[in-house]
């Protein structure tokens, strides 16, 4: 009897261990190594790396039901969630697998033409730049030096300035509905100012976004970068993050998205991704990188000094149909026309 009891215990342990070692996963196979919206994929279930047959199998991509063989045209660019529901050995299972979907086309290469140069305070650690009524507004960074500035760039005249408390590191800014929105870097807080008086009215906290980098608007919502591959869409009234897009090329996600400007449904964003002064032209709806502008030569045209830093200011002037570009501790602002090659 004692031997049978021990055999029974061994059997229980064996069954338990067998169940613990059962690793289910979703298999996603395709002819292409990199998924894009034209990819056709086959979805299956694997158990311990072997394909198996299951019952009541259903697949979903971002909660939309799909067939086992499906086209990724319904997917969004960036991260996508694949869910499987099925029954195996009389047990109901739910699995989740994330895949990345990239842009179908390579980015176009853009060039630029310098059509003007203007003085810029060489001491300013520029973090954000935007025009309103032909007046340039600038946000600057560094703890103890961060500020919000109102500037007549054509006459080299500082009109007004507001300084942040020393604990705050200023970042991007944008202007919408007669309000100035300004970010801070790691404090996870932003500030709202009255456009006319430049007096601070209130602050707001970040949601899921990790940090504050760049800020822009499309006339309806705010668009905020946080140093990752994501740009967050924010309701300007509730200040809640309502959605996000992920920035991708045909091969990779692009992180370190920084200063932003939105023109004609395109987001112009500078990035440190390529270790040079580059601005990406991004589809505002999908996150695809449609173009790349290499501004690397601009830094050679400003005064060279030990504290000279990267390009980090881009503002569009609607009246002149041109962009104004500067950088951290640059002594010039460049007016440029962007040319699609």
Protein language model features and the residues they cover:
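C-terminal motif of bacterial Sec signal peptides marking the signal peptidase cleavage site
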Residues: 13-16
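Edge beta-strands of extracellular beta-sandwich domains
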Residues: 68-70, 91-103
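A short helix->beta-strand "capping" segment at the edge of beta-propeller domains
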Residues: 102-123, 153-159
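A short beta-strand motif characteristic of beta-propeller blades
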Residues: 113-119, 157-164, 199-205, 243-252, ...
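Beta-strand-rich domains and repeat architectures in extracellular enzymes and scaffolds
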Residues: 115-147, 161-174, 327-329
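Beta-rich, blade/repeat-based domains predominating
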Residues: 122-133, 166-177, 207-219, 251-265, ...
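Conserved beta-strand positions in repeat-built beta-propeller and related beta-rich domains
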Residues: 138-142, 182-187, 224-228, 269-274, ...
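Short loop/turn segments that connect beta-strands within beta-propeller blades
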Residues: 151-156, 194-198, 235-239, 283-287, ...
């Amino acid at each position: 009897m004692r031997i049978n009891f021990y055999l029974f215990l061994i059997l229980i342990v064996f069954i338990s261990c067998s169940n613990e070692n059962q690793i289910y996963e979703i298999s996603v196979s395709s002819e292409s190594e990199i998924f894009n919206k034209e990819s056709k994929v086959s979805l299956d279930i694997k158990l311990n790396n072997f394909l198996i047959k299951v019952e009541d199998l259903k697949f979903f991509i971002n909660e939309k039901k799909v067939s086992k063989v499906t086209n990724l045209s319904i997917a969004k660019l960036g991260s996508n969630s694949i869910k499987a529901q099925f029954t195996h050995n009389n047990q109901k299972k739910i699995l989740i697998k994330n895949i990345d979907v990239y842009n179908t086309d390579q980015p176009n290469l853009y060039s630029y033409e310098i059509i003007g140069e203007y003085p810029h305070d060489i001491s300013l650690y520029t973090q954000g730049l935007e025009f309103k009524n032909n007046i340039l507004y600038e946000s600057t960074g560094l703890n103890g030096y961060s500020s919000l500035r109102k500037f007549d760039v054509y006459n080299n005249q500082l009109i007004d300035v507001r300084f942040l408390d020393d604990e705050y590191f200023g970042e991007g800014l944008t202007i919408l509905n007669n309000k100035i929105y300004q970010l801070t870097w790691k404090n996870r807080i932003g500030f709202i100012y009255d456009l006319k008086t430049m007096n601070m009215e209130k602050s707001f906290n970040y949601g899921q976004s990790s940090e504050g980098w760049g800020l822009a608007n499309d006339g309806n919502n705010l668009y905020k970068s946080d140093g990752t591959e994501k740009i967050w869409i924010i309701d300007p009234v509730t200040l809640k993050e309502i959605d996000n897009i992920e920035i991708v090329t045909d091969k990779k996600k692009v992180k370190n998205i920084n200063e932003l400007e939105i023109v004609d449904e395109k987001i112009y964003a500078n990035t440190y991704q390529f270790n040079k002064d580059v601005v990406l032209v991004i589809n505002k709806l999908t996150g695809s990188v449609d173009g790349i502008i290499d501004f690397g030569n601009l830094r050679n045209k400003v005064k060279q000094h030990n504290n000279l830093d990267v390009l980090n200011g881009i503002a569009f002037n609607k009246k002149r149909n041109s962009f104004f570009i500067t950088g951290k501790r640059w002594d010039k602002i460049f007016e440029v026309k962007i040319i699609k090659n």
